[in-house]
Every structure is written in C-alpha cells, then in structure tokens.
Amino acid sequence: KLEHAGWAIGSGEFLTIVFVGVILLGVLGFVFASALGAVAGVTLGAFAPFAVLSRAAGRRLAAIQGQLADTLMVIASSLRAGHSFLQSLDSAAKEIDQPAAGEFGRVLREIRLGRDTDDALEALVERVGSQDLEWAVTAIEVQRKIGGNLAEVLETVANTIRERETLRRQ
C-alpha cells in the first residue's frame, strides 16, 4: 500500500508513525478528556494513518490512470518516429507529469540496470494497481513477443482507455 501511495518510506517507518500517533493522541486524549478521551485518541491514532495512506493511494491511482492514455500516446509517437522502446519510455518519462513520469522513469532505470523488460513492466503494474495499466502492459508484452506495430497497438489501447473513461463519467 505504501508503494501504491507513492510514499518513500518502509513499513517499519510507517508502523513507527502509527505507534507514535497512538501514544501521542492517547496521552492528549487523556489529558484533555480523561479515560474516554484516551480511548478515542488511541483509536484515532491507530486508524488515521491507514486512512490517510488509503486516500493517498486512491488519489495517486486516479492521477496515473488519468495520465495513462497520454503516456501511451507519447510512447507510440516516439516509436513512430523510429525510436526504440526504451527511448520511447525515456521520452514519456521526460514529457509527462508526475506521478506517471516517476513510475515510467523507474521502469526505465530498472531495465537499464539489467532487469528484464517484462519483469520491470509487471512490477509497474504491481506498484500502481491499475487495471487499465495491466491491460496496456499485457498488450506491450504480447506485441513485443509476436512482433508487429507496437505504436499502433498503443494508440488503440490509449483510445480505448479514453473511451472507457468517458463512459465511466457518464
């Protein structure tokens, strides 16, 4: 969930924040409202960080999904211009906004450090948790294996994502 939210902390650090919140809000609740206030403070301290984390993950997912069609179009345009898939990922990471730029930049760095392209893309899907992204990555993997016009496939996927988003809004 921490990666889904884009938070650069580990689970141990997050649990420390929860623990400190429980203690701090419990003490404050006791000082200002006796034992019942302490119980309320402990409860709030235990659940508030998870609620904030969940909300941040939801916002980030919505932001990435909102950028996905444009990101795929940037990659497709770069492929049409004759660039390799990695160069196209680099273009997307530079041209699009955060948080998608950071995620695609991370994929590119992982591949450059020796990670298999399919594995890096699958890790992206795991981190983000978007069904549309999973569909796009599956299309990329299939197209890379069987060959063909990846730019055309990405444009089709991007257009389909846009159409689905339009239907969701209605």
Model-derived regions: residue spans:
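Glycine- and small-hydrophobic-enriched helix-loop-helix hairpins
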Residues: 70-167
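Hydrophobic alpha-helical signal-anchor/transmembrane segments
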Residues: 1-73, 94, 129, 165, ...
